[in-house]
Amino acid sequence: MNDTVTIRTRKFMTNRLLQRKQMVVDVLHPGKATVPKTEIREKLAKMYKTTPDVVFVFGFRTQFGGGKTTGFAMVYDSLDYAKKNEPKHRLATHGLYEKKKTSRKQRTERQNRMKKVRSIKKASVGAAGKKN
């Protein structure tokens, strides 16, 4: 980790309902490339005395000319709360969720079955396709 990289948090909020701390993160990195998210996660985990697996960072934008990047971070109280509240795509980037992918042929057959019916019956046709 670079010593010249500074991480500041602002708009800090403790969200008791979702068991997390949420904040806007400013990363100051003058004369350097954008800092990797993994590095930011590790530094935030050290700041809030927790492990990096419960820290979720996203939405980073580097200002024109570089030197400053702003994003959003959430630090959960435990991994269970994180799995419950975080969107699936964000869990997937952490390696905590894997989507069950059906074969292309099954998806196409299901799509074609759904084309043959109209309105709310599509749901029952789609569900029947999942059972097989």
Curated annotation (Swiss-Prot):
Subcellular location: Cytoplasm
The UniProt record lists the keyword NADP: no
GO MF annotation, one: structural constituent of ribosome
Key words, A-Z: Cytoplasm, Ribonucleoprotein, Ribosomal protein
Domain of life of the organism encoding this protein: Eukaryota
Biased composition (Basic and acidic residues): 96-112
Chain residue ranges for the region called Disordered: 91-132
GO CC annotations on file: cytoplasm; ribosomal subunit
InterPro entries, per database record: eRP_eS24_sf, Ribosomal_eS24, Ribosomal_eS24_CS, Ribosomal_uL23/eL15/eS24_sf
SUPFAM superfamilies per UniProt: Ribosomal proteins S24e, L23 and L15e (SSF54189)
Record GO biological process: translation
PANTHER family (UniProt xref): 40S RIBOSOMAL PROTEIN S24
Family (UniProt): Belongs to the eukaryotic ribosomal protein eS24 family.
Record's function text: Component of the small ribosomal subunit. The ribosome is a large ribonucleoprotein complex responsible for the synthesis of proteins in the cell. Required for processing of pre-rRNA and maturation of 40S ribosomal subunits.
Assembly and binders: Component of the small ribosomal subunit.
Protein name: Small ribosomal subunit protein eS24
Annotated organism of origin: Oryzias latipes
